[in-house]
Curated annotation (Swiss-Prot):
Family: Belongs to the PsbL family.
Keywords (A to Z) from UniProt: Membrane, Photosynthesis, Photosystem II, Reaction center, Thylakoid, Transmembrane, Transmembrane helix
GO biological process: photosynthesis
A Pfam family this chain is assigned to: PsbL
Transmembrane annotation, as ranges: 18-38
Job of this protein: One of the components of the core complex of photosystem II (PSII). PSII is a light-driven water:plastoquinone oxidoreductase that uses light energy to abstract electrons from H(2)O, generating O(2) and a proton gradient subsequently used for ATP formation. It consists of a core antenna complex that captures photons, and an electron transfer chain that converts photonic excitation into a charge separation. This subunit is found at the monomer-monomer interface and is required for correct PSII assembly and/or dimerization.
Lineage: Bacteria, Bacillati, Cyanobacteriota, Cyanophyceae, Synechococcales
Protein name: Photosystem II reaction center protein L
HAMAP family reported in the protein's UniProt record: PSII_PsbL (MF_01317)
Length: 39
C-alpha cells in the first residue's frame, strides 16, 4: 500500500468537488426561488 503523490490528481479532485458544490448551490437556490415564486 504505497501512496505516490501525483500532482495531476489533486486539481482534478478539487475541481470535481467544487463542481459538485456549485451544482448543489445552484440546485438549492433553484428550489428556494421556485418555492418563493410559486408561493
Amino acid at each position: 500500500m504505497e501512496r505516490n503523490p501525483n500532482p495531476n490528481n489533486l486539481p482534478v479532485e478539487l475541481n470535481r468537488t467544487s463542481l459538485y458544490l456549485g451544482l448543489l448551490v445552484v440546485f438549492t437556490t433553484g428550489i428556494l426561488f421556485s418555492s418563493y415564486f410559486f408561493n
